[in-house]
Swiss-Prot record:
Cross-referenced Pfam families: Nitro_FeMo-Co, Radical_SAM
List of residues binding [4Fe-4S] cluster 2: C305, C308
UniProt record similarity statement: Belongs to the radical SAM superfamily. NifB family.
Domain Radical SAM core: 60-309
Residues that, per the record, bind S-adenosyl-L-methionine: Y80, G128, T180
Organism: Rhizobium leguminosarum bv. trifolii
Pathway(s) it belongs to: Cofactor biosynthesis; Fe-Mo cofactor biosynthesis
Keyword Repressor: no
Protein name, as recorded: FeMo cofactor biosynthesis protein NifB
Gene3D superfamilies xref list: Aldolase class I, Dinitrogenase iron-molybdenum cofactor biosynthesis domain
Length: 490
């Protein structure tokens, strides 16, 4: 099955009199917010997140993660989950092509670490629950910490079995934990969780949701007390918990969560989930972005999540899991840190260069305070404009205004240009999804897609190829506001 476009609808907006649709995307009116990554942060926290792609928007441009699918057992049933479903092209949490033993996981981790110098994090995110299937989780992470000592370790959990393992996590030097928390009101929980398995018995209904809620809050508090960074994932389910997630954000902030990641429900009927089979709709992209903006000022909001598979490998948006199948793990391979050390030195230079260039580009702009552009960018990583439009598997969307710029989300797409030929239907789907944006910045784009985008009111440019993204969108913004001739830029 093809991954395809999301079911979430993105509608068009009318252009302003000046020809730049500067304030809306879909049904959503944008605020003038900048990046949600805090400017002032304790040095110890910066050190913890600087190379963790899931906890830092900047880090995800440079560093890769690896999920090891060893935890197959789970202790709750979610209405949005069916772990039995798998497709090589399907990208969503809980999906894995193969379950690994702890020994296979170690060999895969070493193979990936030797071939992917960007690797900085090894985690267990399913396909079941890392804390409930604790024996396998522990048997996997301990040897990895011994054999690959320069990677960070993390886990993802529903939180039900988390409290009894927090001290073990500290002893194993696991510094990052993600908890999926979809409610703090058990009445809402009954619409999401049919049952849980806790303390040797199965619970249903309000009792199940109450126990889960209490255990999640306890686990989060324990992580905070012990200095483990906690990220909270929440699935936005329209009509079920979408408004309630504002309350969830307040609760997790009070208990020390570092980051809150609100993800859209994925409810394709073919996945066989309760929600999918009952036609529960997923949120429109405009609804998701609007909710994330309403959460600003609470726990830091994550906007670069890719809803990764339980066996994901590589940079976010550039999965390489299929390069490392079971038969490709040499039994006697040992870890060699040379490539990774060289890469880290390169990235330090890149980051210093990016900081200097962005500082030079940050010239104050004289413009109306409500003037805002929506800019799409294709990138292969490194924080640069370096992605060919026809080969892109995702498009990042930025808002930019006089006060600054910020990543507001991304669109997952199928590349329309394969083997030198373009798939017309795929291209049309992508163009429909980009309606309402102002400019597309990419490294290259063909004449036909460029003209089609222009007819939809989206200008495309390859003039900033190789530039840092922040620098490129800032320069483009100034050119537009000053009514400069855009022939050289567009």
């Amino acid at each position: 099955m093809s991954r395809g476009m999301s079911k979430c609808r993105i509608t068009n907006t009318a252009p302003s009199a000046r020809g730049w649709k500067a304030t809306t995307f879909g049904d959503y009116a944008f605020s003038s917010r900048g990046s949600s990554e805090p400017n002032a942060m304790a040095p110890a926290i910066i050190e913890q997140i600087k190379d963790h792609p899931c906890f830092s928007r900047e880090a995800h441009l440079y560093f890769a993660r690896m999920h090891l699918a060893v935890a197959s057992a789970c202790n709750i049933q979610c209405n949005y989950c069916n772990r039995k479903y798998d497709c090589a092209n399907e990208s969503r949490p809980g999906v894995a092509s193969h379950r690994l033993t702890p020994d296979q996981a170690l060999r895969r981790a070493i193979a990936v670490a030797n071939e992917v110098p960007q690797l900085s994090v090894v985690g267990i995110a399913g396909p079941g629950d890392a804390c409930y299937d604790w024996r396998k989780t522990k048997a996997t992470l301990i040897p990895i910490a011994r054999e690959i000592p320069d990677v960070k370790l993390c886990i993802s959990t529903n939180g039900l079995a988390l409290p009894e393992h927090v001290d073990d996590l500290v002893d194993m030097n696991v510094g990052h934990v993600t908890i999926t928390i979809n409610m703090v009101d058990p009445r809402i929980g009954t619409k999401i969780y049919p049952w849980i398995f806790y303390d040797g018995r199965r619970y249903n209904g309000i009792d199940a949701s109450r126990i889960l809620h209490e255990r999640q809050m306890l686990g989060l508090e324990m992580l905070t007390e012990r200095g483990i960074l906690a990220k909270v994932n929440s699935v936005m389910i329209p009509g079920v918990n979408d408004e309630h997630l504002i309350e969830v954000n307040k609760w997790v902030k009070d208990r020390g969560a570092f980051m809150h990641n609100v993800m859209p429900l994925i409810s394709e009927r073919s996945h066989g989930t309760f929600y999918g089979l009952n036609d529960q709709r997923c949120p429109a992209t405009s609804e998701l972005i609007a909710l994330r903006d309403r959460l600003e000022g609470g726990t830091q909001v994550m906007r670069h999540c890719h809803q990764c598979r339980a066996d994901a490998v590589g940079l976010l948006g550039d999965d390489r899991a299929r390069e490392f199948t079971l038969g490709q793990f040499p039994a006697d391979e040992t870890y060699d840190s040379a490539k990774r050390n060289a890469y880290r030195q390169l990235i330090e230079r890149e980051r210093r260069g990016q900081t200097l260039e962005e500082s030079d580009a940050a010239t104050p702009v004289s413009a109306p305070s409500d003037e805002l552009l929506l800019i799409a960018v294709t990138t292969k990583g490194g924080g640069r404009v370096n992605g060919h439009f026809g080969h892109a598997q995702e498009i990042q969307i930025f808002s930019v205004c006089q006060k600054g710029n910020g990543l507001i989300g991304h669109l997952k797409i199928d590349p329309y240009c394969l083997g030198g030929w373009g798939e017309e239907a795929t291209l049309n789907t992508i163009i429909d999804a980009l309606k309402g944006l102002d400019v597309l910045i990419c490294s290259e784009i063909g004449k036909s897609p460029k003209n089609k985008l222009a007819r939809r009111g989206v200008r495309a440019t390859g003039a900033y190829d190789g530039s840092y993204i922040e620098q490129a969108i800032g320069a483009l913004y100034r050119a537009v506001l000053h009514n400069e001739a855009l022939a050289t830029a567009i």
